[in-house]
């Protein structure tokens, strides 16, 4: 088909007959065929079509079918750069705004993007149309747009791309534009909910490293890791820019929407009070997604319409996103809005609430939320938090959660921060609390790397006994306590050496030797069964694993116990 003649000729016929459907069908055929042509011919086609519809005589055609052409041109966006983007922008600005709005929302929801640029182009088109729509019920349009935005965003995040920064940027500015386009309370509330959804999606993909950056600001025993891991935060600058933009919108809404703080904290309190937690795989619920798929252009309704109709296309808060907003806001603004929320809604069960919350976040695949979980511990100032007896069990569960996170991650910076918060928190507790946690971990924890870490901590505590006047600390090396620990060693069945068990066994031998040189061991207390198992296994693995360190400590212990 010779489209150079067909396009203007068919346009003339369409004007005369007002048969815009036939003209639209012709353009669809031409654009579909051109998708297999070379890039130069595609570019020439898009430019030709753009120039044709820009002519004043074709204004009516443009207004009538722009919404349809956008869908036809979208596959060229990201391929025929500039020309396709400019054409979509022209169609959005000159087509019927309501029809353009509907079509672009539909395309966002359907997904199937080949590049992030298609997502960005559609969002720009929607906002262009939204600014030309006059309505008495703006919240209907805003809610439909936000549902479409997050459906499209969830789809585009499945694509591996270096352009995600631009995707986040346009998503943030889209919420901001919608907020300023219709500055009324109903739209403000919708945008407040949108902030929570965006925060949830953002942290499901990105990591702000708030916990590690907080650790770097301290001067403690973990400072030695600064030089080794100093490059870990090099990518945080761009993410900080995005995060601060989200928080700026959040703050604006908090200041302009009456009772907004109460609305968001009450929602979070209700969700946290529930016994179960449903993890969402996307930013909107299945009900909202179904609404989005079937959404029509919001028609003007008379004043007798019920409020129930308004809720048909309403987005909802994302609880994880709400909590993340308060946490991130606390980091950038040197406040503690997260702790303010806990004190306001859970004054007597702060630790229990944090333990429950962290247990949820730890189970998520997202490193971003794991980082948030650890930073929330810093916000609570766990190392100096006065733990009542009624919450000691929750403290233990919380620390076990952080320990589990440290053992299961391959990220050095996250492992460092998790272990740091556990150690610093234990140091601030009474010796009885510390000892209880140590024994519980050694007896019950199935993960050898966690048992290795806690045994190392126990060894350091034992070394403090001699120079300490603290009565409770002496229980760390009492005969009964050591007997319990050695029973754990002896109960270790089927000792087979591998990378993890090697570290644990090495730590047990170092621990025994440290007790021996402090004259805290006797023949009656020595874990003979365990020691014999280890000695036998080392001989079996001769040459297969680096066992020289184990042999060294076994020889030392043998010589001192003869």
From Swiss-Prot:
It is found in: Cytoplasm; Nucleus. InterPro entries: Glomulin/ALF4, YAP-bd/ALF4/Glomulin. The modification Phosphoserine is found at residues 285-286. Residues 288-308 are annotated as: Disordered. The keyword Iron-sulfur does not apply. Belongs to the UPF0649 family. This is UPF0649 protein C1442.02. It comes from Schizosaccharomyces pombe (strain 972 / ATCC 24843).
């Amino acid at each position: 088909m010779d489209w150079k003649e067909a396009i203007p000729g068919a346009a003339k016929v369409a004007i005369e007959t007002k048969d815009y459907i036939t003209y639209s069908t012709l353009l669809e055929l031409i654009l579909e065929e051109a998708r297999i042509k070379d890039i130069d011919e595609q570019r020439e086609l898009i430019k030709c079509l753009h120039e044709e519809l820009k002519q004043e005589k074709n204004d009516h055609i443009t207004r009538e079918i722009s919404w349809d052409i956008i869908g036809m041109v979208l596959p060229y966006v990201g391929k025929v750069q500039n020309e396709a983007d400019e054409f979509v922008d022209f169609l959005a600005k000159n087509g019927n705004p309501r029809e353009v709005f509907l079509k672009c929302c539909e395309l966002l929801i359907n997904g199937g993007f080949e590049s992030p640029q298609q997502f960005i182009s559609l969002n720009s088109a929607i906002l262009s149309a939204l600014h030309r729509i006059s309505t008495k019920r703006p919240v209907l349009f805003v809610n439909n747009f936000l549902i479409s935005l997050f459906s499209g965003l969830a789809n585009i995040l499945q694509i591996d791309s270096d352009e995600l920064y631009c995707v986040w940027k346009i998503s943030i500015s889209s919420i901001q534009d919608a907020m300023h386009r219709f500055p009324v309370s109903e739209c403000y509330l919708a945008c407040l909910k949108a902030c929570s959804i965006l925060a949830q999606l953002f942290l499901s993909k990105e990591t702000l490293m708030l916990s590690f950056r907080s650790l770097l600001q301290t001067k403690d025993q973990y400072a030695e890791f600064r030089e080794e891991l100093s490059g870990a935060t090099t990518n945080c600058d761009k993410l900080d820019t995005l995060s601060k933009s989200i928080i700026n919108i959040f703050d604006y809404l908090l200041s302009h929407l009456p009772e907004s703080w109460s609305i968001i904290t009450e929602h979070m309190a209700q969700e946290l009070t529930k016994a179960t937690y449903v993890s969402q795989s996307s930013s909107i619920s299945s009900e909202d997604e179904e609404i989005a798929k079937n959404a029509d252009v919001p028609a003007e309704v008379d004043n007798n319409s019920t409020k129930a109709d308004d809720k048909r296309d309403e987005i909802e808060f994302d609880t994880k996103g709400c909590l993340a907003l308060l946490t991130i806001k606390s980091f950038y603004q040197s406040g503690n809005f997260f702790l303010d929320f806990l004190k306001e809604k859970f004054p007597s069960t702060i630790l229990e609430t944090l333990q429950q919350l962290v247990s949820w976040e730890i189970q998520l695949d997202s490193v971003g939320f794991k980082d948030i979980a650890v930073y929330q511990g810093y916000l609570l100032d766990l190392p100096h938090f006065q733990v009542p007896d009624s919450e000691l069990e929750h403290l233990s569960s919380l620390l076990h959660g952080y320990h589990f996170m440290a053992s299961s991650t391959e990220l050095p910076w996250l492992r460092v921060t998790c272990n740091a918060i556990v150690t610093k928190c234990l140091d601030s507790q009474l010796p009885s609390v510390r000892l209880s946690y140590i024994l519980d971990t050694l007896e019950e924890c199935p993960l050898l790397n966690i048992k290795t870490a806690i045994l190392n901590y126990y060894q350091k505590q034992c070394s403090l006994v001699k120079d300490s006047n603290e009565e409770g600390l002496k229980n760390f090396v009492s005969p009964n306590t050591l007997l319990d620990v050695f029973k754990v060693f002896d109960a270790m069945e089927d000792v087979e050496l591998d990378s993890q068990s090697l570290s644990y066994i090495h730590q047990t031998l170092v621990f025994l030797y440290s007790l021996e040189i402090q004259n805290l061991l006797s023949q009656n207390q020595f874990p003979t069964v365990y020691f014999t198992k280890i000695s036998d296994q080392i001989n079996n693995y001769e040459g297969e694993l680096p066992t020289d360190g184990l042999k060294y400590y076994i020889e030392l212990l043998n010589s001192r116990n003869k």
